[in-house]
Amino acid sequence: MNHRIKSLLILLIVAASASIHASDIEPPFGIRHYDIGKAQNFSLLDIDGEPFQLDKTRGQWVFLHFWASWCGPCREEMPTLQLLADTFSDKQLKIVMINTAEDEDTIFTFLAAINVELNSLMDTDGLVTEVWRPRGLPTTFLINPKGEVKYQAIGGREWEKPLYINFIKQLVSNKN
């Protein structure tokens, strides 16, 4: 009898620990569950002319962020995105910034003026933005290591605040 109880307890513990997924982590205010399945792949050049493909980020959490230099909330939150990037290594959280439909000179001038070291992809024709359909700018999608979109944040955030940092720490420590 004692052996059966031990076996049952072990089975329950294993089942409970296996069932904890990123979707079970409750997001802070302003971030919503957005479980829409596999993230749509894309290829874009960054501001240095280097190619980027979303599918190559599999195996890590991705912070996919759509922005524009003319967007007031985008401008305000940019320094907090730099602090977020400084908090997490590229292996923990891949921050992917996509500028929507602006030219390279505009992007360079803007990023230099606000003194951040963030790289950005250039969606100069707006086609990737059309596919992803952010409901406003800025919009952030959080994509799990399996390549599935799990969360969305519309509008600017103070990403350096502990509630967002702690939420993202929970995500990156959970590989589901």
Summary of predicted features, one role per range:
Residues F66-L83:
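Conserved redox-active cysteine motifs that mediate thiol-disulfide chemistry
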Residues Q60-V62, F66-W70, G136:
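Short pre-active-site segment immediately N-terminal to redox-active cysteine/selenocysteine motifs
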Residues S19-N41:
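N-proximal helix/coil linker or "cap" segments that precede and/or mark the start of modular domains
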Residues T109-E117, D123-K169:
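Thiol/disulfide oxidoreductase modules built on the thioredoxin-like
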Residues Y34-I36, N41-V62:
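A short beta-strand-turn-helix
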Residues Q92-E104, V116-D125:
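Thiol-based oxidoreductase modules, predominantly thioredoxin-like and allied folds used
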Residues M1-L8:
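Bacterial N-terminal signal peptides that target proteins for export
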Residues L8-S17:
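Bacterial N-terminal signal peptides
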